Regions:
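C-terminal effector modules of nucleic-acid-centric enzymes and ribosome-associated factors
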Residues: 403-405, 411-493
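Accessory interdomain/linker segments of ATP-dependent helicases and helicase-like nucleic-acid enzymes
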Residues: 255-396
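Beta-strand-rich binding/interaction modules
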Residues: 395-404
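Extended non-globular interaction regions in eukaryotic gene-expression and organellar proteins
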Residues: 118-119, 127-135, 147-285
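Long, charged/polar, low-complexity intrinsically disordered N-terminal extensions
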Residues: 1-115, 126, 132-174, 233-234, ...
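Short aromatic-glycine-enriched beta-strand elements
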Residues: 50-51, 383-386, 422-423
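Flexible loop/turn segments at secondary-structure boundaries
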Residues: 42-46, 122-127, 368-377, 395, ...
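Non-catalytic nucleic-acid-binding interfaces of large nucleic-acid enzymes and RNP effectors
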Residues: 73, 81, 379-383, 417
Length: 493
């Protein structure tokens, strides 16, 4: 935990409600999100009990499995879930655009992409496991299943994989999204409770955040947000209701038992459902960060590519081989670096973390030379000088290059340091002439920020060894076998 994060939590305790740690929203919020609140059977990794799912607060579908250990009923549940999810996904495949890559190839990209919300990371993992459990089911031969079941499995697997990509917003967890924008007065572990976290952020009238969070700890008042259920509910309600379904002797009795089970599970799901939509309202009240749209464009591209693979019948790999795994890891490392830089440049509150750590600073321009030219080369270049004074704990180094926060395309080279001030030589973002464009060079009295990192790090091609130069353990060709000599054979014996 950083110093500022600890300070924000302490201030939340003092003020009695969560403190904002972001001035803008750092993830995309869809106009028509699909909210899913799943519950699973205790002790089973991918045995669904129920799910409440829908695209609006008053239009929810409740799907249940009266006997979660019955694989036939489980597949029937997944088929019903596919009837909700797949039509939602198909609406985003209608409107597309034709684009041309740098290599001259034409490709199609959807104008929008789906967004599924779950209450917490556990919900994300459960949906991914549920998808992986059925994505290879056969639709022909012995014991065939409807085509929608493995198709939903492929899509849920893709959503789960994409959710691990830093900056992606196709399958966000609500507790993670709220914690990224507010600091509560409780521990990080306690922030995993959606009701308690929302109690700090938006406490009921007459309650402090701590009081609202304490009430949220009572499973009778605020049932768990899933996918795990409360042990008391499991023992006192769920187990007897499932036993009653098992003991039913005819279809009428089973129907009554299933209805009783659905009513009970609906009571567990409804409070979390309301919390999810209230959380979406709170997030939508924040202005969107400048770089959010670019990250959503990446999500749209990933969605479009996978949809094309599904349409062409390209199989989904069971697991990554060595080279694709390396590429995936490198892409995620780059995406994480870019996400951190973009959020800092979008949000002054996020940039504070870097200012405290000495990776960035803000200062006042005390002198500006906008018309200065560098004549050291064969041709003169426009290289204005600005003198900055700062009180931030920033230790500049002569020769290092800094990026301007207000003008990300403009960099400043540290050429001189004098006490609490420094001289920067500017380049970029001023036009191509020997006279700077109006407003492109800071003037005396301007307040500016500079950082040691960029909002968009270098994103060139991933250079991996050729296949013949890759070890066989990592996808390369197997070593050539040579028969052992007589001496070597005797040693092996």
């Amino acid at each position: 935990m950083s110093v500022l994060a600890a300070l924000a939590k302490a201030e939340a305790v003092r003020a009695g409600r969560a403190q904002a740690t972001a001035a803008v929203r750092h993830l995309h919020l869809a106009e028509r999100p699909l909210v899913a609140v799943p519950l699973r059977l205790a002790g089973e990794a991918a045995a669904p009990v129920a799910i409440m799912i829908g695209t609006s607060p008053g239009d929810q579908n409740v799907l249940t499995v009266p006997q979660p250990r019955d694989r036939v009923l489980r597949l029937r549940f997944i088929e019903q879930l596919a009837d909700v999810v797949l039509p939602y996904l198909s609406t985003f495949l209608v409107d597309t655009e034709e684009l041309t890559s740098k290599a001259g190839e034409t490709y199609t990209r959807c104008l929008d992409a789906p967004q599924m919300w779950t209450p917490n990371p556990g919900g994300v993992n459960f949906l991914k496991l549920l998808g992986r459990s059925v994505r290879f089911h056969r639709v022909d031969g012995d014991n065939p299943v409807p085509e929608s079941i493995p198709l939903l499995g492929r899509w849920l697997t893709w959503f789960g994989d994409r959710a691990e990509h830093p900056g992606s917003a196709v399958l966000p967890a609500m507790t993670a999204a709220l914690s990224a924008h507010w600091a509560s007065g409780q521990s990080t572990l306690e922030d995993g409770n959606l009701a308690a976290l929302l109690g700090w952020i938006d406490p009921p009238s007459g309650f402090t955040g701590a009081q609202a969070a304490a009430l949220a700890e009572d499973p009778l008042l605020s049932p768990p947000a899933g996918p795990a259920t409360d042990p008391g509910f499991d023992n006192e309600e769920l187990a007897p209701l499932i036993a009653a379904y098992n003991a039913a002797l005819d279809d009428a009795a089973r129907s009554v038992a299933a209805e009783r089970l659905e009513r009970s599970l609906r009571g567990q799901l409804e409070p979390t459902w309301q919390l999810m939509w209230r959380s979406i309202e709170l997030l939508s009240a924040l202005p969107e960060g400048a770089s959010v749209e670019n990250r959503w464009t990446d999500d749209r591209g990933a969605f479009s590519r996978f949809a094309a693979d599904v349409a062409e019948g390209i199989p989904q790999a069971r697991r990554d081989s060595a080279v694709p795994a390396v590429r995936r890891l490198l892409e995620r490392e780059r995406a994480l670096e870019a996400l951190q830089g973009q959020c800092a440049f979008d949000d002054p509150l996020r940039m504070l973390e870097h200012r405290v750590s000495g990776a960035a600073f803000r200062g006042t321009v005390v002198h500006s030379e906008p018309e200065r030219l560098d004549r050291s080369g064969s041709r003169p270049k426009l290289r204005p000088h600005i003198h900055l004074r700062t009180t931030d704990p920033f230790i500049a180094v002569v020769g290092e290059e800094l990026t301007c926060v207000e003008r990300p395309k403009q960099t400043g080279l540290v050429v001189e340091i004098e006490g609490d001030s420094m001289v920067l030589e500017l380049s970029g973002g001023m036009g191509r002439k020997l006279v700077a464009e109006p407003g492109s060079v800071p003037e005396e009295g301007d307040d500016l920020g500079f950082a040691r990192f960029k909002p968009t790090p270098f994103n060139g091609m991933l250079n991996l060894p050729a296949r013949e130069e890759t070890p066989w353990t990592h996808g390369g060709p197997p070593p050539e076998w040579t028969p052992p000599t007589d001496d070597e054979g005797e040693e092996l014996q």
